Every structure is written in structure tokens, then in C-alpha cells.
């Protein structure tokens, strides 16, 4: 008998911000894990992902024991032997927004504009964005720098939620994403070369609405 179950929706790239995510795809994924949880023995090892945020949502809600994450340029599962993934853009994590974006001169200008016009210097997000802005040019010219910055942020994000008691992790993740959503609502749209949603708040909002 199997002692573990690993479930991943390979077509789901939860950073895309598609309008179907929050009302249909994310709830359906949650329902699937709820049903599995009702059928599997309690001691079964359960794993979800890799995704960007839905793995954390499922884990924080107690629907899986482990959240699988991506390594490299994609937080998404690619089926072995399937079509090769498209060439990856070089990205950086926008830590205050709980998402990533393509590292480009346009992103650097976008950050500078919002730092000057939208984000107070007393806001902790100001220092976070300033750090990213200083990284972008080097990330554009490196195959590794952006990946390391994203991985470092992701570990810090995971550790923050993991520090909450088991029963409070879903609420902790909700509150964390809520702060990112509120900030994102005040910012201008991301550059036109961003392949996912250009709305700074959308990724956090869609994940937040499925935390509880």
C-alpha cells in the first residue's frame, strides 16, 4: 500500500492571474484535496505542488502535509517527456507583493516611479522595493542571481508562515497576502512585457481569497 500521495495540477501556473483562478480553478483544487483527505488514512504523507502559492495555501489549510516548490526558473510542474517548456525569462521576486516579475529596464523604471510617487519612505515596502531595484541590472545579466533572490525570498516567506501554530497558519497566510494585496492596489500596472497579470495586487488577492 502506498504511504504517500503527491498531487500536482501540471497545467496550473498560479502566477498568471487568470480571471478563472479565484472562483473556479483554485476552489476546485481545494475540493480535490479535501476529498482526498477524507479518503486517505490519516498517516498518509500528502504533497501538493510545485506551484507558486497554492501549495502554501493547501499546506497552511492543513490539506497536505508538505508543500512542494520549484527549483530554477519555474514554480510549475512539467511532465517528463512532454513538450519542452518555453525559454524562461530572467525574473526577480517583488517581495512586498508576494509575486515575481520579469527583470528588465521597464521594471526598474516602474519601481522607481512607484517609489517616488506611491510608496512612502516610512513604509517597509520602500526598502524592499529599493533592494529589488538595485538588483535588476545584475539579474538581467546573470543566469543565477534572480533565481537565488527568488529562492531566498521564498524560504523567508515559507518560514514566516511555518512559525505560526498549525491551527493559525491559514490565517497567518491570509493576513500576509492581505498586506501585499492592499499595497498592490495602490501601485500602477506592471510593465507591458510582463507575461502574467500586470495588476500588482492580483496574485496576492487570488491566493488570499482561498486561504480560509
What are these regions, as identified by a protein language model?
Residues 1-73, 78:
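Eukaryote-skewed repeat-based solenoidal scaffolds used as protein-protein interaction platforms
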Residues 22, 104-106, 165:
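Helix N-terminus capping/helix-initiation residues
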Residues 33, 58-61, 94, 133, ...:
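Intrinsically disordered, low-complexity regions
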Residues 55, 73, 89, 114-116, ...:
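Detector for Asparagine
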Residues 87-135:
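Charged, amphipathic alpha-helical linkers/stalks
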Amino acid at each position: 500500500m502506498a504511504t504517500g500521495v503527491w498531487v500536482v495540477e501540471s497545467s496550473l501556473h498560479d502566477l498568471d492571474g487568470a480571471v478563472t483562478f479565484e472562483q473556479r480553478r483554485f476552489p476546485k483544487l481545494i475540493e480535490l484535496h479535501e476529498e482526498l483527505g477524507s479518503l486517505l488514512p490519516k498517516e498518509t504523507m500528502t504533497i501538493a505542488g510545485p506551484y507558486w502559492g497554492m501549495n502554501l495555501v493547501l499546506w497552511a489549510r492543513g490539506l497536505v502535509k508538505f508543500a512542494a516548490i520549484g527549483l530554477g526558473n519555474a514554480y510549475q510542474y512539467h511532465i517528463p517527456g512532454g513538450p519542452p517548456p518555453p525559454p524562461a525569462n530572467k525574473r526577480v521576486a517583488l517581495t512586498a507583493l508576494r509575486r515575481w516579475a520579469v527583470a528588465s529596464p521597464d521594471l526598474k523604471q516602474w519601481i522607481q516611479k512607484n517609489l517616488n510617487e506611491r510608496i512612502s519612505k516610512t513604509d517597509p515596502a520602500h526598502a524592499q522595493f529599493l533592494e529589488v531595484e538595485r538588483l535588476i541590472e545584475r539579474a538581467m545579466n546573470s543566469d543565477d542571481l534572480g533565481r537565488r533572490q527568488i529562492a531566498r525570498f521564498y524560504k523567508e516567506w515559507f518560514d514566516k508562515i511555518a512559525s505560526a501554530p498549525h491551527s493559525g497558519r491559514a490565517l497567518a497566510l491570509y493576513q500576509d497576502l492581505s498586506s501585499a494585496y492592499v499595497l498592490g492596489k495602490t501601485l500602477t500596472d506592471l510593465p507591458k512585457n510582463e507575461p502574467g497579470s500586470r495588476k500588482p495586487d492580483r496574485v496576492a488577492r487570488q491566493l488570499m481569497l482561498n486561504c480560509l
